[in-house]
A protein has these predicted regions:
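Glycoside hydrolase catalytic-domain context in secreted enzymes
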Residues: 1-354, 360-372, 376-378, 398-791
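Short beta-strand elements
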Residues: 378-395
Length: 791
């Protein structure tokens, strides 16, 4: 695929995920002959991505002023020239700041402006466009201070100045996640576009929306509160011990259940056109619910709508949120006056609640209200499913119970969100009875009863050395190859390969030998004909770079890669086809480079807006997170015919990595119910729908146990319940006892600095040899899915 085609897709996908939050007085789209004045440093030096491993070193991004000028919009020249001159003279280390792990930044100093220049721009322009930007990322959470979560003094002054001087104003939010917007309650702007971090085509995609070449169609995949204190997570974020006291009430589940009015609701987003969603039918087939609707474009622009389906479950033994997202679909482009029929489907058993008392998923008796609309705060009742008795859908094992005092909030005294006519809609709704006999019970046996078996060399094979070529030819099994390996070879294979000379300065990007700038690679062996697998960071493309101080020169190949939109943009698009296409484009870049594994996508829940890596992740909702990850995985691992491509994704970070500062030593205290229904659910969806070939664990602990060495998480749930059949790897330089990695089900220690501890443990018997052999088998099975498939 030619690069121009990938950048064209990146531009389209970026525009599809930018949310129009406000559009008063018909300011947008801009007139074809509009004259605009651009304010804010990101208007001239846009943040295309966040910092850390999620950053990209591709071509310089298209700037906002460039995109507008190429679209035929007149950008005030004197203001532009002043801004570009000052920016160039004061760029300092901004051009390499995200390459040095100790120089992360959230904000760029603003451009000083003479009031006379602003007056001139106001007299000669029709519209003022102000861009507010924020950069955050790995090891770089936002902070509750000015210039981070809050606007800086310079930004506040600029807001007031633009508001006072211009009659028509547009605000662009070039941010990875929510920042405080309370100043705009007083100093109002006519239009607000949440551009997020959109990759290298940022300026062109923004111009496409501002000029109306593309009609906005994105919706919020996370709730934005009016103030930070409105989130239930504000008192428990980023500490050494973090109690997830909100339980299942995350994001809109909290705001709706406790009736806290958000600034921008989950699922909200405006368009230049308008739509009518008419519910036409609801059906029940076994446990599957189908809701049919007709979407009509009632406005004057061609556009796309996102139809969302929510479920309100009855309370019983367990409290339930006011509603949960259970299905969604994005229409095709609908012309004015035209319609499209859609069907939203979901299986009611997928939304059973976890009862910790007996480690079971249950559907409780009562009425399940089905709602359809275009945001969480704009739905109508489509019907109801009734269940006469409690039914257990899954019998599991207690795996991740809290082992200390832990209290969660309750909705007992809360009054939930409602809307005019809701009670009447529920009373008049079509009711469909679910027969308990139609609900199948799934029982998971304890995985502890089936431990790995020690592999030994058969007598007839003692004079034969089997290789991976023999496995490929059908002359041997992977197990026969691994059975031959001595302790050193086993310890080598379960560690990433750090080439000679890099051990003492093993920075990200310096450890791979196969592809310079890659994040790491697996061990290779001529003896067993086993090639190395190289992996590179994501999730917005392939990042090839070396972190350090001083910053090293980029590799030539790094700039050939496309910087695609961030995970948040992809989620805001609610477009699964775009997710699949993004995966296919990334796969093409992997092929160019010789990279087999992509360390992406990331699908941790956006629990709190301060998390620096929110831009990498998809949503506060596990359904959106899981489905986005699944479709990206489809695009990477499968071609259009469903055949394996020889490339793979590594979904990450399992699990509850919801703060990036102090991430290696924090303990997330979470009820097993909240874990299973919120923080693990997206991973479960991605695994069950797409079977990614690899998965990465997170740095943090859950309930006192590091995720990287947690048997219950990696073997009991991931493999025992979800059926994951791929390889698990650690994050780079994680904590956790080396003797526990493979026993827990963590196969590959990255970047590879635990070889000696594991070798000693093998030789002393402190580690189960059969578990290490099993991990090597999984690694070789991954190699068979990649290198040999490509050949």
């Amino acid at each position: 695929m030619e690069r121009i085609l990938k950048t064209a897709f990146a531009r389209e996908a970026a525009a599809g995920g930018m949310v129009l939050l406000k559009n008063d007085n018909g300011v947008l789209p801009l007139a074809k002959d509009a004259k605009v004045a651009l304010f804010g440093r990101p208007s001239y030096y846009v943040f295309r991505m966040g910092s850390g491993s999620g950053d990209m070193l591709a071509q310089p991004p298209r700037q906002i002023y460039q995109g507008l000028e190429d679209a035929g919009i007149s950008v005030h020249s004197a203001l532009k020239e002043h801004s570009l001159k000052w920016h160039t003279e004061n760029i300092g280390r901004l051009d390499i700041i995200n390459r040095n792990w100790f120089e992360w930044t959230n904000i760029m100093p603003e451009i000083p402006l003479d009031e006379a220049l602003v007056d001139q721009a106001a007299a000669e322009s029709d519209v003022a466009i102000l861009t507010i930007g924020r950069c955050c990322g790995e090891d770089n959470d936002l902070r509750l201070e000015k210039g981070s979560f809050y606007l800086s003094d310079e930004e506040e002054a600029l807001v007031k100045l633009v508001n006072a001087k211009f009659k028509k104003t547009v605000l662009l939010l070039n941010v990875g996640s929510m920042i405080d917007l309370s100043i705009f309650d007083t100093y109002s702007f006519d239009a607000i576009l949440y551009t997020a971090l959109a990759g290298e085509t940022s300026g062109d995609a923004i111009a496409d929306l501002l000029t109306g070449r593309i009609t906005p169609s994105a919706k919020m995949a996370a709730t934005w509160a009016k103030k930070y204190e409105d989130y239930p997570t504000t008192k428990e974020f980023g500490g050494a011990i973090t109690h997830y006291s909100e339980g299942i009430y995350v994001g809109y589940r909290y705001f709706d259940t406790f009736n806290v009015e958000p600034r921008y609701a989950f699922g909200y987003g405006l368009s230049y056109t308008s739509f009518d969603i008419a519910i036409t039918d609801i059906r029940l087939d076994g446990t599957v619910v189908d809701v049919s609707a007709t979407v009509k474009n009632t406005g004057n622009y061609a556009g796309r709508e996102v139809v969302q389906c929510y479920l309100s479950a009855p309370d019983g033994k367990l409290e339930k949120a006011y509603q949960d997202l259970v299905a969604y679909i994005k229409t095709d482009l609908i012309a004015p006056g035209e319609s499209e029929d859609v069907v939203l489907s979901f299986d009611l058993t997928d939304h059973a609640s976890f009862l910790e008392d007996n480690a079971s998923y249950i559907l409780e008796p009562g009425k399940y209200i089905v709602r359809v609309g275009n945001s969480s705060r704009n739905t109508h009742v489509a019907g109801a499913i009734t269940l006469a008795e409690e039914v257990t859908t899954v019998k599991a094992c207690t795996r991740l119970a809290v082992n200390m005092f832990h209290r969660e909030i309750s909705k007992k005294d809360a009054t939930p969100y409602t809307y005019a006519g809701e009670a009447e809609e529920i009373a008049a709704a079509t009711e469909l009875a679910l027969d308990p006999a139609d609900i199948e019970l799934t029982v998971f046996a304890p995985t502890e009863t089936n431990p790995p078996k020690l592999l030994t060399v058969a007598d007839e094979d003692k004079n034969t050395t089997y290789t991976l070529d023999d496995v490929r030819a059908g002359r041997a099994t992977v197990e026969q190859v691994v059975a031959q390996m001595d302790s050193f070879e086993l310890a080598s294979f379960v560690n990433g390969a750090i080439y000679e000379g890099a051990e003492k300065n093993a920075t990200v990007g310096s450890m791979a030998k196969k592809v310079h700038g890659a994040a790491g690679e697996t061990w290779s062996s001529e003896k067993y004909a086993i090639p190395a697998n190289a992996c590179a960071d994501g999730p917005s493309g392939i990042r090839l770079s070396v972190f350090g101080s001083p910053v090293e020169t980029d590799t030539d190949m790094a700039h050939l890669m496309v910087a695609f939109p961030s995970g948040t943009i992809l989620a805001n698009s609610w477009d699964l086809d775009a997710a699949r296409k993004l995966g296919a484009c990334v796969k093409d870049d992997m092929d160019i480079l010789g990279i087999e594994g992509w360390l992406a996508p990331g699908l941790n829940i956006q629990r709190n807006p301060l998390n620096g890596r929110n831009f990498e992740y998809y949503s506060e909702d596990p359904l959106i997170s899981g489905r986005c990850a699944a479709y990206v995985t489809y695009g990477v691992q499968c071609d259009d015919d469903g055949e394996q491509t020889g490339f793979y994704t590594t979904i990450k970070h399992l699990a509850a990595n919801n703060s990036d500062c102090n991430r290696g030593y924090c303990d997330s205290i979470i009820s097993e119910r909240a874990l299973r229904e919120i923080y693990l659910k997206g991973f479960q969806i991605a695994v069950e729908e797409a079977q990614p070939h690899a998965l990465m664990t997170s740095y943090n602990m859950i309930n006192g146990m590091y995720c990287s060495t947690n048997y219950d998480l990696l073997t009991g749930i991931l493999r025992g319940e979800w059926g994951f059949d791929g390889m698990v790897m650690t994050d780079w330089n994680c904590a956790g006892a080396p003797s526990l990695f493979q026993y827990a089900g963590n196969d590959l220690v990255m970047p590879g600095n635990s070889k000696q501890p594991i070798l000693r443990a093998l030789e002393t018997g402190a580690i189960d040899r059969a578990s290490v052999q099993k991990s090597v088998c999984r690694i070789l099975e991954l190699v068979l899915k990649t290198n040999f498939v490509k050949k």
